[in-house]
UniProtKB/Swiss-Prot annotation:
Cellular component GO terms, alphabetical: plasma membrane; plasma membrane-derived thylakoid membrane
Positions with a binding annotation for [2Fe-2S] cluster: C107, H109, C125, H128
Protein name according to UniProt: Cytochrome b6-f complex iron-sulfur subunit 1
GO biological process, one term: photosynthesis
Organism of origin: Synechocystis sp. (strain ATCC 27184 / PCC 6803 / Kazusa)
Classification via InterPro entries: Cyt_b6_f_Rieske, Rieske_2Fe-2S, Rieske_2Fe-2S_sf, Rieske_Fe-S_prot, Rieske_Fe-S_prot_C, TAT_signal
Keywords per UniProt: 2Fe-2S, Disulfide bond, Electron transport, Iron, Iron-sulfur, Membrane, Metal-binding, Thylakoid, Translocase, Transmembrane, Transmembrane helix, Transport
Functional summary from the UniProt entry: Component of the cytochrome b6-f complex, which mediates electron transfer between photosystem II (PSII) and photosystem I (PSI), cyclic electron flow around PSI, and state transitions.
Gene3D superfamilies the UniProt entry points to: Rieske [2Fe-2S] iron-sulphur domain, Single helix bin
Subcellular localization: Cellular thylakoid membrane
Length: 178
């Protein structure tokens, strides 16, 4: 005699089916919420030039046309939002064009922001007194390193800022921030 029974496929009760559907609904809703929160906290990719460059922006995040900066007097240092939103000085040269080197406004001593002093023709950090020459090299410490620089290019009245990849023109060596 054979005492084996055929195994019947499991049948879901109404309660199990409703629990499964409710759990699936909660999981889908939570996933959609997590995706939306992730998109909120991750900044959108910047669209810009080649080499990881971005368009220079004002404090409100609006692109700044090159003509606006170039309307300033020669020697002017205009502060814009550059790479990663870092404040960056753009320099109007004596011939009325924009310098291809921008200077990031972050002291190499402790990261303070600093103004350009037109009377003394140098950047002066108010936190601990570091001073920098117009090209961003250290004039007086305690800052140990020259200021970070970026590449600046003008294309169709748009200012593109991209990371500095060449040798530092002030030292002739590989930049310390690369």
């Amino acid at each position: 005699m054979d005492n084996t029974q055929a195994i019947a496929p499991p049948s879901y009760s109404r309660r199990q089916l409703l629990n499964f559907l409710a759990g699936t609904t909660v999981a889908v809703t939570a996933s959609a919420g997590a995706y939306a929160m992730g998109k909120f906290f991750v900044p959108p990719a910047e669209k810009g030039g080649a080499g990881g460059g971005i368009i220079a922006k004002d404090v409100l995040g609006n692109p700044i046309p090159a003509s606006q900066i170039l309307a300033e007097a020669p020697g002017t240092r205009a502060l814009v939002a550059g790479l990663a939103g870092d404040p960056t000085y753009l320099i109007v040269k004596e011939d009325g064009s924009l310098d291809s080197i921008g200077i990031v406004d972050s002291c190499t001593h402790l990261g303070c922001t600093f103004p350009w002093n037109g009377n003394d023709q140098e950047f002066q950090c108010p936190c601990h007194g570091s001073r920098y020459h117009p090209d961003g090299s250290v004039a007086r410490g305690p800052a140990p390193l020259p200021l970070k620089i970026v590449q600046v290019a003008v294309v169709d009245d748009q200012i593109f800022i991209s990371p500095w990849t060449d040798l530092d023109p002030r030292t002739g060596e590989k930049p310390w921030w690369v």
